[in-house]
């Protein structure tokens, strides 16, 4: 009897630690490996792209890149993707897009990065044009370092195309409902484990004592890893098509749930939906407020990181360390987030994100505005300069804001859709994705880039008081939106329970 109990206990423990059945490993492990390779590249690109742009062009250029290059490029990429889907099989679409990224990484690693003087315009010409046309100086500087701008854009597109689109589309296509409940939670943990691995890889290859290549080619080993990783993604995808999709135990198209077509609304239709439904408008405001407030703090923080770590290598190593902490904090929030949601009200859970943003944002901006006071009173005690403390507080703010998003912010946002009737839920969610998604991601960048165009003599140092003011206004509006949405939410919940 005791042996049977012990076996049952071990069986249950195994299901908690590794909920994948033995025969399913043939499907899960290659899928997980594909995701790991995609995320290894994703997190490496995220660390490197800022290092090139911030140190060679300027922190201010990031908002211009996001608004005027990345956003249009994402639209063009989606149009090309749709066209490819019309003329090629889905399997071949995957190969074409992944091969494009692989080809670009090779081009950048062996041509654009090693020979910047050959591919970029004359530095003096760019500087003279910037002085002659100050309102457009950031556009001119971006053109002057166009290869780094292209790398930044490709890095942004990798996450959108490879992870959000191609990987999840493939995973959703071949995964049964019963499998998804076990597979997808494991994917979430794996996703965040890729971040600390990236941090270790970047820290090793960019360390001053590591001399694998010439000093001016320090990033080449990282590019080689990304090229290898991209090649492994293609091989794994090919293997799965040959060995998993032909195994009836693991893939039966008839058993895979038919995907429901999501409601698609135009930009104008989405605006009408948001302005005519107070409930949907509140949800859109939450998403916009989150995206804008994160971008406003992140821009100022990155300008301070550049002051502390002025070289590409030092800056990239620091961003790698940032991702290390972000990965573990995200895992911690994933584990505790569901418990918080079970034990507190919707209002309390939804308030955690804006209050955390307000408190950490206030601490970050305080260390910038009152750096002279801090230098006199706290530097000796804390054995750190005001700049170091500001960068540290900014990193904590960024780590927490991204960690809490996936566990609490997204969960409470999705819970808010549940009490709505089916028509409003489907159309409202589509409207929020169109308006909230676009304005949330690009809103902060639009504010910053417009400010720098109107006031060309300003950099982040001069503009920080204005960005801080906008940040606090946005977060306060966010808090009021949560309160307003909670009232509407409780009315619908009580109505549905009757």
UniProtKB/Swiss-Prot annotation:
Disulfide bonds: 37-85
UniProt GO molecular function: ATP binding; ATP:ADP antiporter activity
Pfam families: TLC
Main localization category: membrane
Task performed by this protein: Provides the rickettsial cell with host ATP in exchange for rickettsial ADP. This is an obligate exchange system. This energy acquiring activity is an important component of rickettsial parasitism.
Family statement drawn from the similarity comment of this UniProt entry: Belongs to the ADP/ATP translocase tlc family.
Protein name per the record: ADP,ATP carrier protein 1
Organism: Rickettsia prowazekii (strain Madrid E)
Gene, per the UniProt record: tlcA
């Amino acid at each position: 009897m005791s042996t049977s109990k012990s076996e049952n206990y071990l069986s249950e423990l195994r299901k908690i630690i590794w909920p994948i059945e033995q025969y399913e490993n043939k499907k899960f492990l290659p899928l997980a490996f594909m995701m790991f390779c995609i995320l290894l590249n994703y997190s490496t690109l995220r660390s490197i792209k800022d290092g090139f742009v911030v140190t060679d062009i300027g922190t201010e250029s990031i908002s211009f890149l996001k608004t005027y290059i990345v956003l249009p490029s994402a639209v063009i990429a989606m149009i090309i993707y749709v066209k490819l889907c019309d003329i090629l099989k889905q399997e071949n679409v995957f190969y074409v897009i992944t091969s494009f990224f692989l080809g670009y990484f090779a081009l950048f690693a062996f041509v654009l990065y090693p020979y910047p003087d050959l591919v970029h315009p004359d530095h003096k010409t760019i500087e003279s044009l910037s002085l002659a046309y100050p309102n457009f100086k950031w556009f001119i500087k971006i053109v002057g370092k166009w290869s780094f701008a292209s790398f930044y854009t490709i890095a942004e597109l990798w996450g959108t195309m490879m992870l959000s689109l191609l990987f999840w589309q493939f995973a959703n296509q071949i995964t049964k409902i019963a499998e998804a409940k076990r597979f997808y939670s494991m994917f979430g943990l794996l996703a965040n484990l890729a971040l600390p691995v990236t941090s270790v890889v970047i820290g090793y290859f960019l360390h001053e004592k590591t001399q694998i290549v010439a000093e001016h080619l320090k990033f080449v080993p990282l590019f080689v890893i990304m090229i290898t990783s991209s090649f492994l993604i293609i091989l794994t995808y090919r293997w799965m098509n040959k060995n998993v999709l032909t195994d009836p135990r693991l893939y039966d198209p008839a058993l895979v749930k038919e995907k429901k077509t999501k409601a698609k609304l135009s930009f104008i239709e989405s605006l009408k939906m948001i302005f005519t439904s107070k409930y949907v408008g509140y949800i859109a405001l939450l998403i916009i407020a989150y995206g804008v407030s994160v971008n406003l703090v992140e821009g100022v923080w990155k300008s301070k990181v550049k002051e502390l770590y002025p070289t590409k290598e030092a800056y990239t190593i620091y961003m790698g360390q940032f991702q290390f902490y972000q990965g573990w904090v995200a895992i911690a929030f994933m584990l505790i987030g569901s418990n918080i949601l079970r034990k507190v009200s919707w209002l309390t859970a939804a308030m955690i994100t804006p209050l955390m943003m307000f408190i950490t944002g206030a601490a970050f901006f305080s260390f910038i505005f009152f750096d002279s006071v801090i230098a006199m009173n706290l530097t000796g005690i804390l054995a750190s300069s005001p700049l170091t403390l500001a960068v540290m507080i900014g990193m904590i703010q960024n780590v927490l804001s991204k960690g809490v998003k996936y566990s609490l912010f997204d969960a409470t946002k999705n819970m808010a859709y549940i009490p709505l009737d089916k028509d409003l839920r489907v159309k409202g969610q589509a409207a929020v994705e169109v308006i909230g998604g676009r304005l949330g991601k690009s809103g902060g960048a639009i504010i910053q880039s417009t400010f720098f165009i109107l006031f060309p003599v300003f950099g982040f140092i001069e503009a920080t008081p204005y960005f801080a003011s906008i940040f606090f206004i946005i977060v306060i509006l966010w808090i009021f939106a949560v309160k307003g949405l909670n009232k509407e939410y409780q009315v619908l919940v009580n109505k549905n329970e009757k």
